[in-house]
């Protein structure tokens, strides 16, 4: 099934100059970027994006982390893109992420460390958790006119 999913390269990924390396991984497996922009979100937008977490103990650290610098927001399209991106990104805690995933390869944080510092875990990437969430997040982050339809070589060989 062809799906669209939201991916955010968080401020730690941007500040560490990992944008190209992360995007290349998604393109290498045939995912198509149909929307992309750099934005610096404020606390109000953070509350909209992380609405499920606003009342949780860790939210203030999460809000500080996501608003500390620019974010690359992308909509990726492809076959089973929600599931594929989640597999590629890896476990939320980089310490437990499987080797070969983005978080295992590029992030170092653990819950133990970040909890001791009172900060949110820096895990480089946000990826929609399921198809329903992906639809909601894409609509929150992108206007319809910011999403594009075009063909790639993968359309010929995969779809």
Name each model feature, range by range.
Residues 1-159:
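Non-catalytic terminal and connector segments of soluble metabolic enzymes
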